[in-house]
Amino acid sequence: MAYEKGLILIPARYNSHRLPGKALADIAGKTMIRRTYERCKLTEMHAMVVTDDKRIVDECLTHSIPVDIVTEECKTGTDRVARCAERNLQVDWIINVQGDEPFANPDDILKVAHQMEHGDHREVVHGMSLITNPDDFWNTTIPKVIAWDGLLKYISRAPVPYPYGPNEELWKRSGYQEVCIFGYFKHHLKQFMQGQIKSRHEEIEDIEVLRFMEMGTPVRMLELVGSPLHVDTPADLERAQLIAKEYDAKE
């Protein structure tokens, strides 16, 4: 088993605002949470789903997927991961792969794992990928990343850095989007849970990594390949059907 000191946790809730029940949504014959777990297991790391809903627990148990239920109210997936981690998990660090990533790239996860194993313990690790589609740059459901010297400076749903002036193609040289893979040590998660409220910019943008920034925790950004789709809306779910069939045909 790879990276015995770490564990992949997959937070999943049923009551998603933009796509209720999406963790159990069917994607070409498999639920989204099952597909996400199977992608994570391609890394050969230990992985477990963390949820607040018995329906998701039942789905996991049906397919022999390790699962933990967190009954406390959690404002974000990272809060849910933190609740699970505080139960004395016997690992040094945790990778969070969000439950709506049915096409998560296992090589990306392993790149984050390598950084966790060999990087600076003071840093949270996060992923980003180059934006290649102009629609993604202007899409407010996709967080855009501002980083230099390998560290996150800001992340926003707005199209940033904004290509001011006549040359709107400038985004091609500087546009990066969030990849929803995170790495934390336990002390990061304990700090994240303090106060039990969202930070100011986290609340405005609805992007949880901003809480770490506002606490003064450095966030190391790794350039990753990324996945073809993060499922957040009904339209995304429709696209996912086609992508899943392509993936399944290759296996």
Task: Locate each region found by the language model.
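Conserved core of the sugar-phosphate nucleotidyltransferase
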Residues: N105-Q196
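Conserved alpha/beta core of the MobA/IspD/sugar-nucleotide pyrophosphorylase nucleotidyltransferase superfamily
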Residues: A2-Y3, K172-E251
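Short, acidic/turn-prone active-site loops that include or flank metal/cofactor-
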Residues: Y14, T71-G77, G226-P228
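N-terminal glycine-rich phosphate-binding loop and ensuing alpha1 helix
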Residues: Y3-T51
